[in-house]
Structures are given as structure tokens and as C-alpha cells.
């Protein structure tokens, strides 16, 4: 991550929603750490008590009770340092495949869900016509997630019937992420676009049938 060169982004070869604008190319390393500092990072750092630190203008809570452990791992330190160094300079996203990882640092109110990722903001997020909160997914940018779900992601492929289910159990969580996002989108679209909500719900149902997670219909609103 530190040494990998930053490649140019070509909007013309990307999905349509990314075209028609200029994408600034980040410069410099992701972390301000020197190579010696990186090499010197310890496997774990013990947390004696709950602590709040300011990283790039965002208050991050280091709470053993929230983390479920009384220490930070090296990966946690690198993640937090990247936030400190890059928030406001580079976009910072958390994949939904990491589950509640970012929430364990008290970042829930700063995270805007966009499909399979959650974008970290410097200011707390408030609900609006386009951003809605939903249990299990946090704040979701509904128009953006809808565009990604139906114009970019391969939902039909994920929902394809598999007689033996998803045979590669270690990667099943990726397929489940499709199901969770489409299920949440169905709930968010129930009132504003019932037809698309039904489409998302059918996809979620078909996707979950290929997994061991099962399917739980979203509550009526």
C-alpha cells in the first residue's frame, strides 16, 4: 500500500455513473510513517481504558468493550493512521465485507453507505431526502446505492440459481453482502419506488437461497 504506484483512472472505461467528470489523482504515500516506523510496529498495543482521539477532525473511540478486546492490532493502527493522514485529502471507504469494524471505533454517524462500501466523512451525517438510516446498514445514500445496484453490480449473476448452493464457503460472505445490500435497498425503496423495491427484494431472495444465511423479508413500513 505504501509503495504501490497510483495508477491513472480512465472514466471512459468505467461504468457510466463515473463518467463526465475529472477525478483528481492522489499524490504521496497513504501513511506518513517512514519505512523504519512501519517495520517497528508491534503486533498488538494494549488498551487500558476507553480513549477518544481526534483523527483528521473525527473523534475516534478506542473502547475495549466496543472492540471486544483490550488491545489494538497492527492492522488497526495502520487503518487509524490512514484516516488521520488522508481524511479530507483522499476519499476513505470501508468495505461492507468488514462488517461492523468501523462502527467499533465509534464512526457510525460519519459513515455514508454507498452500495458495498461506506464513505467516511469529516462531519456527522444527517438524514435527508437522499440519505436514510436503516437498521443493520447505518446511513445509506439511496440514489447512489440504487444506481450501483442496478447499473454497476452484477445482481442477476449473484442471484443465478445454483443447485448446490455457494460451494466455496470461505467466500460466501461476499455473496451474502449482495443479498444484504439488495434487501436493505428494497426496504428503502418501498415508498418511493415500489417497482424497483420489488425487483431488489426478488434479487435478495434468490441470492440468499444460494447461501446458508437464509432469507428474512424486510419489515413493512
Positions of the model-derived regions?
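ER/secretory pathway lumenal C-terminal domains and tails of membrane proteins involved
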Residues: 1-221
Amino acid at each position: 500500500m505504501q509503495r504501490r504506484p497510483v495508477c491513472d483512472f480512465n472514466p471512459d472505461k468505467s461504468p457510466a455513473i463515473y463518467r463526465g467528470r475529472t477525478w483528481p489523482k492522489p499524490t504521496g504515500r497513504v501513511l506518513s510513517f517512514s519505512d523504519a516506523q512501519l517495520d517497528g510496529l508491534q503486533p498488538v498495543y494494549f488498551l487500558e481504558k476507553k480513549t477518544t482521539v481526534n483523527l483528521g477532525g473525527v473523534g475516534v473511540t478506542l473502547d475495549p468493550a466496543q472492540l471486544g478486546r483490550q488491545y489494538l492490532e497492527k492492522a488497526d493502527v495502520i487503518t487509524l493512521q490512514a484516516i488521520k493522514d488522508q481524511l479530507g485529502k483522499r476519499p476513505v471507504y470501508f468495505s461492507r465485507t468488514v462488517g461492523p469494524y468501523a462502527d467499533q471505533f465509534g464512526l457510525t454517524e460519519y459513515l455514508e453507505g454507498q452500495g458495498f462500501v461506506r464513505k467516511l466523512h469529516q462531519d456527522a451525517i444527517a438524514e435527508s431526502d437522499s440519505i436514510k438510516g436503516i437498521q443493520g446498514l447505518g446511513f445509506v445514500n439511496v440514489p447512489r446505492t440504487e444506481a450501483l445496484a442496478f447499473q454497476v453490480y452484477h445482481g442477476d449473476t449473484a442471484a443465478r440459481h445454483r443447485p448446490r448452493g455457494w460451494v466455496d464457503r470461505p467466500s460466501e460472505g461476499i455473496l451474502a453482502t449482495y443479498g444484504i445490500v439488495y434487501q436493505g435497498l428494497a426496504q428503502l425503496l418501498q415508498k418511493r419506488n415500489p417497482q424497483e423495491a420489488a425487483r431488489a427484494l426478488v434479487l435478495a431472495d434468490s441470492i440468499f437461497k444460494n447461501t446458508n444465511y437464509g432469507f428474512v423479508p424486510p419489515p413493512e413500513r
